[in-house]
């Protein structure tokens, strides 16, 4: 997939219009500009392509309907390839062009950009990535996960395991297989606290990124005879981990992932072989949500979709719609407060931090973002793969938020003091 510096002005056939040209064509429109600099070519690949497709299709839907609050959405899409110099270049270019938001969809990139976003007052969206302590809006006013962070996801998984064991994990053995990066290591602190609190034994097995070869790890996991397994990665690491878990005979109904597992992963692993595996689900999957049906009817059917129609409704696609909808809701609220702008980072920030009980017409659990809580409430659910789709096995719920917020506050206070 080749992605270069483009402006995607959703709702037109000119989705590949060059950046400057697009700006001139729409000079008569009031616009809000987003920098969508993501990794299309190195590690996250199809994760990014589906997520980005969902975002752009949602922006197209909004613009086809005339925009939001009198504004059109302009999304400048570029490939940073998970490379910090390229990501910083994209960030700085967006800043020069008036972007008020960036979505890098990468933990190392998001971590590197935190000081710039805070200093420049440009809203950085860190959906399912970045620093978990960015949920503390008092420490990170311009870093907004708008989604359940790593720590919350780990807490949800453990709570579901506990429910499976009829309310007690005492004496149980839980294995955590993870990519050996900050993203992969981040849940460890919460898992360690919960191991002490709930009385289970935690065994950890890191693997070298990107995770192409995990053959030495999974026989060790099998020999450990765990009661449950959590595997934690993204992109190729996830499919390799799941393939090895199956090969080593681990029962899929005792294996769970974070949010980073999708239908595309199942196609690689084998849809039938993976039956029973679980994941954290942050929004509704499939094509039943009203907003997905609207995209199909008003964007895709008109030939204005941003990618293959077959990907519409996949997990990663719907994550992109989810985050696009939250961004646009922030614009709507900002425009309601100050219809004539000026469109700045603080202007949008005021809107994003006013989101209240937002569900995108049933796509996501009720989400409320405040100046204190940038996570949005901490709700998710557990879904199980049935061979064709992920089927929810719980309602939306929050779990272990006392432990999660204790960790958030501990780390955010350190950031306030040291900047690290």
Model-derived features: where do they sit?
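Beta-alpha junction/loop-to-helix N-cap segments that form part of ligand/metal-binding clefts
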Residues: 31, 46-53, 65-137, 146, ...
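Periplasmic-binding protein-like
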Residues: 94-106, 125-127, 175-177, 225-235, ...
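Extracellular/periplasmic periplasmic-binding protein-like sensory domains
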Residues: 244-322, 396-400, 411-418
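N-terminal secretory signal peptides and thylakoid transit peptides that target proteins
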Residues: 1-20
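C-terminal segment of N-terminal export signals and the immediately downstream linker at the start
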Residues: 22-37
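Extracytoplasmic "Venus flytrap"
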Residues: 35-56, 78-84, 106, 177-186, ...
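Extracellular/periplasmic Venus flytrap/periplasmic-binding protein
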Residues: 86, 132-133, 141-249, 286-293
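Segments of small-molecule ligand-sensing domains
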Residues: 304-317, 328-394, 419-420
């Amino acid at each position: 997939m080749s992605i270069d510096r483009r402006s995607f002005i959703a709702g037109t056939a000119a989705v590949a219009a060059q950046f400057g040209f697009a700006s001139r064509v729409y000079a008569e429109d009031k616009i809000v500009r987003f920098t969508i600099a993501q990794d299309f070519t190195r590690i996250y690949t199809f994760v990014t392509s589906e997520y980005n497709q969902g975002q752009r299709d949602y922006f197209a839907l909004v613009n086809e309907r005339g925009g939001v609050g009198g504004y059109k959405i302009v999304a400048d899409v570029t490939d940073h390839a998970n490379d910090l110099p390229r990501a910083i270049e994209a960030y700085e270019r967006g800043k020069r062009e008036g972007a008020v938001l960036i979505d890098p969809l990468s933990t190392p990139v998001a971590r590197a950009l935190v000081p710039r976003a805070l200093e420049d007052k440009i809203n950085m969206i860190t959906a399912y990535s970045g620093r978990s302590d960015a949920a503390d809006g008092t420490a990170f006013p311009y870093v907004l996960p708008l989604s359940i962070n790593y720590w919350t996801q780990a807490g949800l998984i453990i709570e579901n395991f506990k429910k499976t064991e009829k309310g007690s994990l005492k004496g149980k053995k839980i294995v955590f297989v993870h990519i050996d990066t900050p993203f992969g290591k981040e849940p460890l602190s919460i898992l360690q606290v919960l191991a002490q609190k709930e009385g289970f034994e935690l065994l950890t097995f890191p693997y070298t990124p990107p995770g192409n070869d995990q053959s030495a790890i999974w026989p060790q996991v099998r020999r450990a005879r765990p009661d449950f397994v959590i595997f934690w990665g993204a992109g190729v690491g996830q499919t390799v981990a799941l393939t090895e878990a199956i090969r080593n005979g681990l029962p899929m109904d005792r294996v769970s992932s974070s949010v980073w597992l999708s239908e595309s992963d199942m196609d690689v692993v084998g849809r039938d072989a993976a039956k029973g595996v679980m994941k954290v689900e942050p929004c509704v999957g499939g094509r039943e949500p009203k907003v997905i049906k609207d995209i199909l009817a008003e964007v895709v059917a008109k030939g204005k979709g941003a990618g293959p129609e077959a990907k519409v409704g996949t997990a990663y696609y719907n994550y992109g719609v989810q985050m696009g909808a939250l961004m646009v809701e922030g614009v709507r609220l900002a425009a309601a407060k100050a219809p004539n702008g000026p469109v700045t980072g603080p202007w949008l920030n005021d809107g994003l931090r006013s989101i209240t009980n937002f569900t995108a017409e049933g796509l996501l659990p009720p989400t409320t973002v405040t100046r204190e809580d940038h996570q949005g409430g901490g709700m998710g659910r557990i879904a199980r793969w049935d061979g064709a789709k992920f089927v929810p096995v719980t309602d939306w719920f929050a779990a272990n938020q006392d432990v999660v917020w204790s960790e958030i506050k501990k780390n955010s206070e350190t950031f306030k003091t040291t900047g690290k």
